[in-house]
Amino acid sequence: MQVHTLTIIAVVFLLAGAVKGMIGLGLPTIAMGLLTLAMPPSAAASLLLVPSFVTNVWQLWLGPSFGPLLRRLWPLLAGLTIGTLTGGLPALAAGSTWTHAALGMVLILYGLWGLAAARLPAPGRHETWLSAVVGYLTGVVTAATGVFVVPAVPYLQALRLSKDDLIQALGLSFTASTIVLGLQLRVTGTLETVDLGVSALALVPALAGMAGGQYARRVMSEKAFKRCFFVGLIALGAYMAASGWL
């Protein structure tokens, strides 16, 4: 692999890791969006496997409340597993272009809603069954499109978690989604072979960027974090919508 290609990979994953460290999501989208400017999409996708999985696990384990969050969110994880393995919608998968655009618009609208200081109502006493429903719907969308964020991310934000607990909850959801999606692809025979060695090269800058983003989050106030979180959702949604339409 040429030096300039390695440099591009390092810079892209450093940036993508920093964003993920700060707001808890966005690494695959940012990395794919930038890498495909310099290489084929298949090559870019092969680089994502190790950094995406490892940064999700790191995000999960470094948080302060793994046990309490696991006990609270197990219905969401159970629903996510069932939805991913059994609820994939062929119609969505066949129309993945417009589906990604629609999901992007949902994130944009939710981000604007959050910046306007409006909030989704907390689920309250309905949290257990609502978590299962949201998990199932997220699993269906994940199986059909490979997108983990809708509707899980808006729902987790509605639980009124602290910034560190929210980041850890996102890591829990994304890690589970990655594992179950991989299992679903393996079972259906659609899991493609990737070069783990090449993918591992991208892990170092991704972790370095993530560490920097985590430091920035630690020194942020809750208010500043929420602003960055919603702006990040808008940017992520805008990219998804644009890539779906163009």
Predicted regions: what they are:
Residues 11, 15, 50-57, 74, ...:
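Hydrophobic residues within alpha-helical transmembrane segments
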Residues 38-42, 63-69, 157-165, 188-192:
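Juxtamembrane helix-boundary/capping and inter-helix hinge elements in multi-pass membrane proteins
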Residues 47-96, 178-223:
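Selective hydrophobic functional segments
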Residues 43-50, 101, 168, 172, ...:
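Signature of the 12-TM Major Facilitator Superfamily
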Residues 1-38, 120-170, 177:
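Selected transmembrane alpha-helices and immediately adjacent juxtamembrane segments
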Residues 44, 87, 91, 141-147, ...:
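Hydrophobic alpha-helical transmembrane segments in multi-pass integral membrane proteins
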Residues 56-67, 88, 102-127, 214-215, ...:
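Transmembrane helix exit motif
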Residues 5-6, 35-53, 97-107, 136-146, ...:
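Structural signature of hydrophobic alpha-helical transmembrane segments
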